Amino acid sequence: MEEEKILESDLRHISFVMPKYTPIEKIGEGSFSVVYKALDAESGRYVALKAITRTSSPARVLDEMMFLKTLGGRKNCMGLLGCFRNEDQVVAVFPYFEPIDFREFISNANLADIKRYLHNLLIAIEHVHSNGIMHRDLKPGNFLYNKESGRGMLIDFGLAQYEEYSEGQHAEGGAKPAGPLLFFNSVVSKTKPPGYYERDGRPPMKAPRAGTRGFRAPEVLFRCQRQTGAIDMWSVGVIFLTILTTQYPFFYSSDDIDSIVEIATIFGHAEMRKAAKFYGRVWRSNIDSIPEERIPFETIVESLNPWAEVGSDGYDLLYRMLDLCSSSRITASDALSHPFFDDLKTHENCA
């Protein structure tokens, strides 16, 4: 079969693990790795083989293995069964976890399903953050969820980092330049028609830019050097909004410029000015699609998914996750204690 020929060609570079593991099919592929479902010849169980690309930084690979050793196998974080190396090729072995397709999940998830999904994800994030680590690439593809069992697994710690700043520093806001810096599209063009935006000609601030477009927090887009686990909670909020609206992806931006504009079309100029000031930036724009005041999440959800079951507690949690200012954004620990999950916890206690 053609599929087998392609599979054999793909697997030549990891043939050194094939005496022990028999690859069955490719189940995932990213910028830095390819993942295969395989059979463990010794145990007879399925496993996932993650073949890390040769172009990956050795330090990055080592860091990922370190984070997996620290976090894996507990609190909904994927465990590491083993790791093999042959010259510059690394293959990590994980338990195989059968997830539901995210698009299928959001197409028919009820409120109880949504609560279980988010609760599982938050348990993993709280575990990560309690160890002083930021995941930095939260998105549906990195959280495997099995609807039948009601269990989820956080995967891919390739971009994870330890937090470098204390809570006190974090609360002060973002990077503090000597003078106000206009961010990307915030320069108002005097020679172009309304709605036009252009780049600030000055050199951009250098700061960590991990994550996937559409899930990056405002402080990442504003190029702030002080970043904490709050960036993960923004990503959880985007996932929550995506589920409620059934729009995946919710943000379609192709780059950071478009990303901040998309956020601004929801939050409005007034909120963007406050956030920019918090991060030591200046926000100005004459783009017609950006309102002065924010559009309520209730309006967005009801217009895109009139049948959505959310409730006041659900919206409150959504607002606290998608808070433009990182210091007041809800933490994973506090989110787990939010009233939105009260009936879920009561049900679990009675089970």
Swiss-Prot record:
Pfam family, one: Pkinase
Entry-linked Gene3D superfamilies: Phosphorylase Kinase, domain 1, Transferase(Phosphotransferase) domain 1
The enzyme's E.C. designation: 2.7.11.1
BP GO terms, sorted: cell division; meiotic cell cycle; regulation of cell cycle
Protein kinase domain span: 21-341
GO terms of molecular function: ATP binding; metal ion binding; protein serine kinase activity; protein serine/threonine kinase activity
Cofactor(s) of this protein: Mg(2+)
One GO term describing the cellular component: nucleus
Entry keywords, A to Z: ATP-binding, Cell cycle, Cell division, Kinase, Magnesium, Meiosis, Metal-binding, Mitosis, Nucleotide-binding, Serine/threonine-protein kinase, Transferase
Catalysed reaction, written as an equation: L-seryl-[protein] + ATP = O-phospho-L-seryl-[protein] + ADP + H(+); L-threonyl-[protein] + ATP = O-phospho-L-threonyl-[protein] + ADP + H(+)
Active-site residues, Swiss-Prot/TrEMBL: 137
Binding site for ATP: 27-35, 50
Top EC class, one word: transferase
The keyword Membrane is assigned to this record: no
Protein family per UniProt: Belongs to the protein kinase superfamily. Ser/Thr protein kinase family. CDC7 subfamily.
Entry protein name: Probable cell division control protein 7 homolog 2
Taxon lineage: Eukaryota, Fungi, Fungi incertae sedis, Microsporidia, Unikaryonidae
